């Protein structure tokens, strides 16, 4: 058997990184959020956590089918959702209930 290694495509992925691996913030890229917006996002994170705990309890009681927790991912889901425009699309997965709630 002969193994052939061949490059069929090369590409790069561009991304924006506000916070680097060492926790340093790029102040130019830091979003400008008002106190009201920050409070709204926090309230949504609390709502997501509350829903998550309720759904997990219902699953353990046999009242709903399989449920995978969002716990620990609230900020990433609410923050990502907050950055969407009204005409943007979202394709949620099994641990994306937080994005749907936000």
For every predicted segment, state its role.
Residues 1-30:
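Charged, compositionally biased N-terminal leader segments and the immediate start
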Residues 34-43:
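Short, contiguous, helix-prone interaction/anchoring segments in small proteins
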Residues 20-21, 33-34, 57-59:
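A short alpha-helix capping/helix-coil boundary motif
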Residues 10-11, 16-20, 43-56:
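N-terminal glycine-rich anion-binding loops that anchor highly charged ligand groups
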Residues 50-53, 57-102:
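Cofactor-binding active-site loop characterized by glycine-rich and histidine/acidic residues
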